[in-house]
Amino acid sequence: MAEELITPVYCTGVSAQVQKQRDKELGLGRHENAIKYLGQDYENLRARCLQNGVLFQDDAFPPVSHSLGFKELGPNSSKTYGIKWKRPTELLSNPQFIVDGATRTDICQGALGDCWLLAAIASLTLNETILHRVVPYGQSFQEGYAGIFHFQLWQFGEWVDVVVDDLLPTKDGKLVFVHSAQGNEFWSALLEKAYAKVNGSYEALSGGCTSEAFEDFTGGVTEWYDLQKAPSDLYQIILKALERGSLLGCSINISDIRDLEAITFKNLVRGHAYSVTDAKQVTYQGQRVNLIRMRNPWGEVEWKGPWSDNSYEWNKVDPYEREQLRVKMEDGEFWMSFRDFIREFTKLEICNLTPDALKSRTLRNWNTTFYEGTWRRGSTAGGCRNYPATFWVNPQFKIRLEEVDDADDYDSRESGCSFLLALMQKHRRRERRFGRDMETIGFAVYQVPRELAGQPVHLKRDFFLANASRAQSEHFINLREVSNRIRLPPGEYIVVPSTFEPNKEGDFLLRFFSEKKAGTQELDDQIQANLPDEKVLSEEEIDDNFKTLFSKLAGDDMEISVKELQTILNRIISKHKDLRTNGFSLESCRSMVNLMDRDGNGKLGLVEFNILWNRIRNYLTIFRKFDLDKSGSMSAYEMRMAIEAAGFKLNKKLHELIITRYSEPDLAVDFDNFVCCLVRLETMFRFFKILDTDLDGVVTFDLFKWLQLTMFA
């Protein structure tokens, strides 16, 4: 049995972000040009296996215990005892990938709590075009079989092509997880494996919302409806959604974990994900009745109330009409009245598809835009509006609404612009094995005042203290995504996505969906420094008292070394009892000398020390001004305001880097680190200004100049 050794080359940090942006500009990540997940190329790997006469084994998701899980399905769990990884060709003499097209009965739940995923897969079978975006044509256990398959999934704004081998978890010769009702089709089991791979393990799929899988199969965006507060036109909404090819799922909420997957007296499963597969009207006793068709991934547990498979209501429906609805017994699919649907279920999810997924000129297409962002402790993770001191540091996005809705779209007489906002946190399932789960997330929308219109600047704390939000996410909740349909008058608005509490880190995707065109942009400050012209005094112009002080400090050589500078600064700072500091380190002082040393001798002369001295005095004034709680140190967020007061405007990425480099583990910034940061910033800006001879904001270095500058900066 072959093992295909995959050795992808990874970029890290800033270089990874640059490479990702270049890939996006080249069109990578679109469905027609999907990114090869983990660098694995399906066609090349398959061709290599066929050429060598071996079957593929995926070292990126190997048939070992950690691929199953980390706790309930971990290496020492009794639930994984006896599991063996086998290929379908070892289980059956004639396994099939798909027989007569993919159908809803191909999906039956196994021992994994991923009914939410299987409900989405069942809905996927209703639309052949969408199905084969996820499950590419041309895969088989017969012609060209090499033990390798591939699937395409949408992952946080981009499509990825995921390769898997066909080694599946089995126990006693049967599949442990998803399987087909007939037992001889394996496309759904292999799709489940691909989904487990991108999420880190099978166990990572346990528990979730159908909307997650809906979106990962389509790139669409999901809306939620509380069926206890259902709008009066919900049945029409469902009909239109099905007509548009949307994917629908529903469930019954539970209030106690002991109720999870408990069966009601009418045979519905609590906390279990169902897919909505159709909606029709039938004539019953002379009246039209609204019906909903449901699918239970378990297969055999079906609704036993009115309009169930063997209920008497069907006897009073015209046989032709009954045949059109294809009522079958015990196949996991059943009909129920819309009235009972509202009464029995508590939540409905509708995944609206994007224009590229719909591929139809007859349907109204969405205008879509998305942005990727991060929340980082101390710089961009400000928490929700309950934390006014830090809320303003969150990433901000502007949306410009110009075209109002068509008059017949809404009942309201007031004109307005409708759009859908969706905030998604990234990679949280994959991080479950490290003890991290979903953060509580949401967003707020603010109207931009007329005097600030058109300005692409990050709004500061005072704005949010003085202005209330115009809209917000309905809840802050620990789901992968929160979304809301919002309607506002034309104008400019600021969207602020956040975690509920400050300093909760994560990556996110913010998506805008609108039926009318709307302008969007990410807000960030432009990098600039408002520095006064540097006035360099000659030795004769320097105050005599300062010369006397310098003579005492410098010694016989009349220059201050790195060690002498450390002694001087720490002696001075120790007299300021209101400052929290560990003192200037030798490395910090070496950095200051390197940055201020103009003649390159590694020491500071009278003029050089005079410049540094005056700067430190100015920095002390700023530090005390922005140490708002008089703790002797600044918080990371106070640091951001202090940097701006010192004349520097930086974008959020630079603020992230500064906090990473200059703050303590508790995100406090001591005076010594504050000084080092500002000295470095000012010197680097001045270096750049000198080197930017064309004044075009671009400087070109050869390798020597680059190393010379960066090694001693």
From Swiss-Prot:
Annotated InterPro entries: C2_III (IPR033883), Calpain_cysteine_protease (IPR022684), Calpain_domain_III (IPR022682), Calpain_III (IPR022683), Calpain_III_sf (IPR036213), EF-hand-dom_pair (IPR011992), EF_Hand_1_Ca_BS (IPR018247), EF_hand_dom (IPR002048)
Reported function: Calcium-regulated non-lysosomal thiol-protease which catalyzes limited proteolysis of substrates involved in cytoskeletal remodeling and signal transduction. Proteolytically cleaves CTBP1 at 'Asn-364', 'Gly-377' and 'His-399'. Cleaves and activates caspase-7 (CASP7).
Protein residues bound to Ca(2+) 1: D597, D599, N601, K603, E608
Quaternary structure and interacting proteins, as annotated: Forms a heterodimer with a small (regulatory) subunit CAPNS1.
Entry's localization field: Cytoplasm; Cell membrane
Region annotation (Domain III) ranges: 355-525
Phylogenetic lineage: Eukaryota, Metazoa, Chordata, Craniata, Vertebrata
Residues noted as binding Ca(2+) 2 in the record, renumbered to the chain: D627, D629, S631, S633, E638
Protein known as: Calpain-1 catalytic subunit
Segment forming the signal sequence: none
Region of interest (Linker), ranges: 526-541
Residues forming the catalytic site: C115, H272, N296
Family in the record: Belongs to the peptidase C2 family.
Chain residue ranges for the region called Domain IV: 542-712
Regulation: Activated by micromolar concentrations of calcium and inhibited by calpastatin.
Cofactor note: Binds 4 Ca(2+) ions.
SUPFAM superfamilies named in the record: Calpain large subunit, middle domain (domain III), Cysteine proteinases, EF-hand
MF-aspect GO terms: calcium ion binding; calcium-dependent cysteine-type endopeptidase activity; cytoskeletal protein binding; enzyme binding; peptidase activity
Catalytic activity: Broad endopeptidase specificity
